[in-house]
């Protein structure tokens, strides 16, 4: 199933990132886009999410230098744009894959495109990884670890449900029971024609 492939890639990305565990490390995609385009895109998507998770931790440091915080905020904005672009590339992959499928007369549209469901699955992998760390943290109290284990159990159940949902959605699209319709996110904050502050600097 697709979800099994995606979840395996997401876990591998996190494991690979944590070897050096720094936002400044170089990125190397383990998958060639000519050989396995969707794996290439999933790996890239998960890497963006993993680095941004670290960015969000760093910027919440109450002692962070304001200049460094501003620089990091710009990196987060760029990362968000990269994330959105990659999600749209993933949807383009599925649009192309299913372009010859004739939607049935009673076919319905899903509230989310496949790629945005995959986006949530990628973020969920990070939540599960970090919540698991809290359940085995040596300096944490038993109460803390127990509370985190309860949360982890919910996250694991959520991953199971979300994995089933994306597999069912792709099956429905491939059978013509549902059809894809993708809207670009139209993010405005990085566009110097749409952000009034940036526009005023031109």
Placement of each model-derived feature along the sequence:
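Anionic, Ser/Thr-rich low-complexity intrinsically disordered regions
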Residues: 1-202
